[in-house]
């Protein structure tokens, strides 16, 4: 016979599981939209003030906000802080790719993007190894936020030791002198296209197909990778 205590305990567990699923979804959304906005904001900073400064600002954003996350007291606070953290993560990508592609003009851009993407996975693997040595529990998880704050030292290193993109410096100098930016045939696209033009013919269909091809793997990848752990817990 099921007692009242057991029923109450089961009801509490059901509510906690529902809340966990809800906030997990919110945190994934915060990551995706935060990264998208961060790419725009910090990408603009990189265009205006230099790739190195844009990259350093991105690192300071996600590491500094990770430190702030150590002090959160509610899921809502964590949601906001995670959004800001992910803005920094999203800002690192365009500035890093731009700096590498402009510094190594002869290298393949897809290859450089792949190197950065692979490096991110290496970081995830190293974090997993840390978790193997120290458990993350309900009562002991805030140290993970401090671990995320460690890259602030990397931001300082970027500011002091990483040289600015020679292409960006040349464009800036040409702009200050009132001259046309130096042209590099390996970097110059066949046609200069404004951002809004990709949503008009004849580029509209190409844009829509590109969005569709990017959406499908993102939905499948994020949908499966972020919910797999919760499904595994429910199964066994």
Regions found by a protein language model. Give the residues of each.
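Extracellular/periplasmic helix-loop-helix junction of adjacent transmembrane segments
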Residues: 1-37
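Cytoplasmic helix-loop-helix junction between adjacent transmembrane helices
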Residues: 81-118
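Helix-breaking motifs and short loop linkers at transmembrane-helix boundaries and internal kinks
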Residues: 50, 71-77, 105
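Glycine-rich segments within core transmembrane alpha-helices of 12-TM secondary carriers
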Residues: 108-136, 150-152
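Extracytoplasmic gate region of multi-pass secondary transporters
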Residues: 201-236
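C-terminal ends and interior cores of transmembrane alpha-helices
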Residues: 60-73, 132-133
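Symmetry-related core transmembrane helices of the 12-TM Major Facilitator Superfamily/SLC fold
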Residues: 142-159
